[in-house]
Curated annotation (Swiss-Prot):
Function: Probable mitochondrial mRNA stabilization factor.
InterPro entries linked to this entry: Atp25, NT_sf
Key words, A-Z: Membrane, Mitochondrion, Mitochondrion inner membrane, Transit peptide
UniProt biased composition (Low complexity): 308-319
Keyword Mitochondrion applies: yes
Record lineage: Eukaryota, Fungi, Dikarya, Ascomycota, Pezizomycotina
Subcellular location: Mitochondrion inner membrane
Membrane topology: Peripheral membrane protein
Region (Disordered), start-end ranges: 36-76, 300-323
Cellular component terms (Gene Ontology): mitochondrial inner membrane
Full protein name: ATPase synthesis protein 25, mitochondrial
Length: 724
């Protein structure tokens, strides 16, 4: 297995097989993705003839042959004489081929259907349509998108009434040539003065490339390598400022001047400013400038409309009885609330709800926010959208409210389209949108509902909609693929069942693998840290476990849940194969991904692999800062069964001050270290009372002094009970 990975990892087909290789061990049956039914006549092209004979010419000729019978309608003699009287028409003058005017092809190129132009925004400037066609057709840029930033208030630093266009070049040379031709085309056609940041002139690019090749040749002859990371050529990003063009502004200067309370100075901006961002594919994924502007635009629209913001709360209101909405039955409400409690909301405070109704007691236990009451007794929920809200921002509004309100706005099930105001307006805008955008937004809506554990939205519904999206040959972006994968791999363990349900169902894993297989055929990179980490966590236990032979009579060990030895070994075989894939593909993890990997290894009691991964973080050149050490000691303080590795854990304490930058002990670290000492050495209090001259006692006194001296920023807190 290891040799096959190392030798065949460069092949695209082998990459797909590597990702799916651990499925056979876990017992999941992999079925190929269903595709549309195509006949053999559609997939097999007709044979081509070598030459065009006269027989083929006769088939397409409009003149009848000599042997064919011609049916002639009887005509009056008067008409015949009139025709004979008419003088013969003069023959048309022959025009040579080099003097004939070239006619543009009326049929569009088939590749244009694969990459359509983005739709024009409201009130576009006249130049915009021609500019998009020139960028796509003449320059050959891919993945063109458009952001309308004219409604940003305050305007961005590039200027007011801004429209930003993004395009992907095939390489560095194509990037420079496209930017140069775009500037020349704007100067010639529209008499504009564009400014291109990062553009190298034609001769300058050739000179730098020639010098770079010469330096590489000299370095090769000297048996050395070029260490300069930035040579000034491979920036991969050129920003072309087209300038201010006529038309496209939303408000006229006279209307701005008449605004009440308008204070300012300077001149009004007339017209629209257009900026074209040209990047290579690698630079566009690295910078994600488009995503940054989209989030800024969505946040600005929320602020302007006065909608609730993330991590914000409304002022407290007078509590009262909660009644069900008029369109939802009590059974549905109670069922939805129980599912909504599974999503933790990151609010600074949580308020309980005082109510006498038994069927809504879950609201108080879950600590959800207070829902105000209408005069007629129905629940008053905030309006999510308005008529001016763009379609791409609708689903994002669901993430900015509480889970209970989001589940209410999502209606009964996946087929519900008009039970709530949100669904009614969402599907109305969906019917007017392009087919590919409508399909992508519907997938996003179902993904959010599954992550909220809505009872009416299932993973089979998501897979069905995703399958239709693939068969329709719509585009799939890496963020969209990761969102689908998160929804398919989402799972909440059930500790109340007998036996406890701690693993993702095999059917859900099969749906995720089929989606991965089809996305890999579209050219999306699968052997990266993000996809690998999602598969690794998805195939693992979601709580700390301990393997036992007799599950019925197994004792409880701390916070660990006993599982059968066969299930534990099956999961470990899958995890071992995934770890081999990571090593063979040389996948580099980020700091947050290392934290997830450490937690999974610790929950599975893989302590040897756990400490190897801890050392791997330092070998990868990542700083092990205070947050990482707090996570390490907190992980051990919340669980048992690691006492055999207590010396390894305690050796990390003197290593903290040797880190770069060093990590010094404060109150937060001292508290978790003291808890770990109490678990690893239960007799530590007796040693402290006897005042033994041991390193453990000195470490205990050091933690106690740090806790007593340092006052936390949030106010004084009592020391842990183990210190008393």
């Amino acid at each position: 297995m290891r040799r096959a990975l190392l030798t065949g990892i460069q092949c695209h087909a082998c990459r797909n097989n590597v990702v799916r290789s651990f499925v056979s061990v876990s017992g999941v049956t992999f079925m190929p993705l269903a595709s549309g039914s195509w006949s053999a006549s559609q997939t097999r092209p007709p044979p081509l003839s070598r030459n065009f004979s006269s027989q083929h010419a006769k088939l397409f000729s409009s003149h009848p042959s000599d042997n064919a019978e011609v049916a002639v309608d009887p005509m009056p003699e008067k008409d015949i004489t009139e025709e004979t009287v008419k003088p013969p028409e003069e023959p048309e003058e022959h025009i040579p081929w080099y003097l004939q005017e070239e006619l543009e092809a009326t049929t569009s190129h088939p590749l244009r259907k694969q990459q359509p132009l983005p739709p024009l925004p409201e009130n576009p400037p006249p130049i915009l349509n021609g500019l998009l066609e020139h960028i796509s057709i003449d320059l050959g840029l891919d993945d063109i998108s458009l952001l309308d930033l004219r409604k940003l208030d305050p305007p961005p630093a590039l200027g007011a009434n801004l429209i930003m266009i993004f395009g992907t070049a095939r390489g560095v040379k194509h990037l420079n040539v496209s930017a140069d031709r775009l500037c020349r085309w704007l100067r010639t056609t529209y008499k504009l003065r564009p400014d291109a940041d990062g553009l190298l002139g034609r001769n300058e690019l050739k000179i730098k490339l020639r010098r770079k090749a010469r330096r590489a040749k000299l370095a090769k002859s000297a048996k050395s390598t070029l260490t300069a990371p930035d040579d000034g050529i491979t920036t991969g990003w050129i920003c072309v400022d087209v300038g201010t063009v006529e038309g496209g502004q939303f408000r006229k200067p006279e209307e701005e001047a008449r605004k009440v309370g308008f204070v300012g100075f300077g001149t009004f901006v007339q017209g629209t400013r257009i900026v074209v961002q040209l990047m290579t594919e690698e630079k566009r994924e690295e910078v994600d400038l488009e995503g940054l502007w989209r989030r800024t635009l969505e946040r600005n629209s929320l602020e302007n409309e006065g909608l609730p913001q993330p991590q914000a709360e409304e002022p407290p209101q007078e509590a009262g009885d909660i009644h069900k909405p008029s369109s939802v039955t009590p059974a549905h409400i109670s069922h939805r609330v129980s599912h909504a409690a599974q999503i933790s909301v990151n609010y600074e405070q949580r308020r309980g709800i005082s109510t006498g109704s038994c069927q809504y007691r879950d609201l108080e236990e879950d600590g959800l926010n207070y829902a105000p009451i209408n005069p007629d007794g129905t629940i008053k929920l905030p309006e999510l959208i308005s008529e001016s809200t763009p379609l791409t921002s609708l689903t994002s509004r669901l993430r900015n409210i509480s889970p209970y309100e989001a589940i209410y706005h999502l209606g009964q099930d996946v087929n519900d389209t008009n039970s709530t105001t949100f669904l009614e307006q969402f599907y109305r805008k969906l019917s007017k949108a392009p087919d590919d955008l409508a399909s992508a937004q519907r997938i996003k809506l179902i993904c959010i509902a599954i992550m909220l554990h809505h009872p009416g939205y299932g993973k089979t519904d998501l897979f069905k909609v995703t399958q239709e999206h693939f068969i329709s040959n719509y585009g799939v972006t890496p963020p969209q693929f990761l969102e689908i994968l998160d929804a398919l791999l989402s799972f909440k363990p059930d500790l109340t069942s007998d036996p406890p349900n701690l693993l993702l169902p095999a059917a859900d894993m099969e749906l995720a693998l089929q989606t991965i297989d089809h996305v890999g055929l579209r050219g999306i990179d699968l052997l990266n840290s993000t996809v690998w980490m999602k598969l690794f966590v998805g195939a693992s236990f979601r709580v700390p476990v301990c393997p036992v032979r007799d599950l019925m009579n197994a004792p409880v060990i701390g916070n660990r849940t006993p599982v059968s030895l066969d299930t534990y070994e099956t999961v470990n075989r899958v995890q071992t194969r995934l770890l081999k894939v990571k090593t063979a593909a040389k996948i580099e993890l980020s700091a947050n991904e290392y934290l997830s990997l450490l937690r999974v290894l610790f929950d599975h009691e893989w302590y040897s692999m756990f400490w190897d991964t801890w050392e791997e973080i330092a070998l990868a050149g990542m700083p092990r800062d205070k947050s990482l050490y707090v996570f390490l000691f907190q992980l051990h303080a919340e669980s048992d069964g690691w006492e055999g590795w207590k010396s390894t854990l305690l050796n990390c304490i003197p290593m903290m001050e040797r880190e770069n930058p060093p990590v010094y002990m404060d109150r937060e670290l001292a508290e978790v270290i003291a808890r770990c000492l109490a678990i690893a050495h239960p007799e530590i209090m007796d040693r402290v009372e006897r005042n033994e001259p041991s390193p453990l006692v000195r470490l205990w006194h050091r933690c106690r002094i740090t806790i007593e001296k340092e006052v936390p920023l949030r106010g004084a807190q009592n020391p842990p009970s183990t210190m008393s």
